[in-house]
């Protein structure tokens, strides 16, 4: 039985509720190569990808996000790691969703700035917790990125966004250890109604990545957990999607 979550609209795709589970992939062309990103995005769309994630290391790289968005008819997610100004720039060009780890982009004022930019354009935020980059105080408490640690990190960031009256949220808690990842999603799904983005991080080689991602993502979906999933284990995102 699928665990129904609240609906979140990502461009022209709605996840959560009884909506179909949306399949994502991620471009792997250097962000400076705008033409290469656009060409790869078109191939992914033709292969049936429903949501496309593009990395954006800096504010200047938002021009790649804009070019890709203008070239395809599927939602574009900006993957932000450390520079909150990159998130602001992506919101300005009308990206469909922003992925951040709030703990990596600075103090609360920077998080608030991103939230306000997303509120103005109704852009959802995915809180992307990664077992390899948990907060120091959480690692000190648990000693390792165990499921309880990842869930605590996710809920901490959810509360931070909610503090700024923002609830247009999707959550992911990825780990390269598949059993840990699966247990973390079970625990998280039991305590939140935000839609869940399911994936395995640092999955390894193509063959190993397919195996680990198939076990982790497939296992969660069989348990009724997950509203969108992402696979990016291959040199070709199209190959990953078709797998």
Segment roles from a protein language model:
Residues 1-25:
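N-terminal amphipathic alpha-helix/helix-capping segment at the start of soluble metabolic enzymes
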Residues 21-35, 77-80, 140-149, 205-209:
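Active-site mouth loops of central-metabolism enzymes
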Residues 106-164:
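Conserved anion-binding
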Residues 139-234:
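Catalytic alpha/beta core domains of metabolic enzymes, predominantly
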Residues 47-67, 102-105, 172:
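Glycine-rich, proline-tolerant flexible connector loops at the mouths of alpha/beta enzymes
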Residues 232-243:
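Single conserved hydrophobic/aromatic residue that forms the stacking wall/gate
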Residues 21-27, 52-54, 76-78, 98-100, ...:
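Hydrophobic faces of well-ordered beta-strands that scaffold small-molecule active sites
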């Amino acid at each position: 039985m699928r665990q129904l979550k609240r609906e979140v609209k990502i461009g022209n795709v709605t996840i959560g509720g009884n909506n179909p589970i949306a399949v994502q992939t991620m471009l792997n062309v250097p962000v400076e190569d705008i033409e290469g990103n656009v060409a790869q995005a078109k191939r992914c769309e033709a292969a049936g990808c429903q949501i496309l994630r593009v990395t954006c290391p800096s504010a200047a790289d938002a021009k790649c996000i804009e070019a890709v968005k203008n070239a395809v008819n599927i939602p574009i997610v900006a993957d932000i790691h450390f520079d909150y100004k990159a998130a602001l720039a992506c919101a300005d060009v009308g990206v469909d969703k922003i992925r951040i780890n709030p703990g990596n982009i600075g103090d609360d004022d920077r998080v608030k700035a991103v939230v306000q930019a997303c509120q103005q354009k109704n852009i959802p935020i995915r809180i992307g917790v990664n077992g390899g980059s948990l907060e120091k105080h959480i690692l000190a408490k648990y000693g390792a990125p165990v499921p309880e640690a990842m869930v605590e990190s996710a809920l901490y960031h959810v509360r931070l966004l909610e503090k700024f009256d923002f609830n247009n949220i999707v959550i992911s808690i990825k780990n390269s250890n598949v059993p840990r990842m699966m247990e973390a999603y079970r625990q998280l799904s039991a305590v939140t109604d935000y839609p869940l983005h399911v994936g395995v991080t640092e999955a390894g080689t193509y063959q190993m990545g397919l195996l680990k991602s198939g076990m982790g993502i497939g296992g969660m979906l069989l348990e009724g957990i997950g509203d969108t999933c992402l696979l990016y284990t291959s040199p070709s995102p199209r190959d990953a999607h078709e797998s």
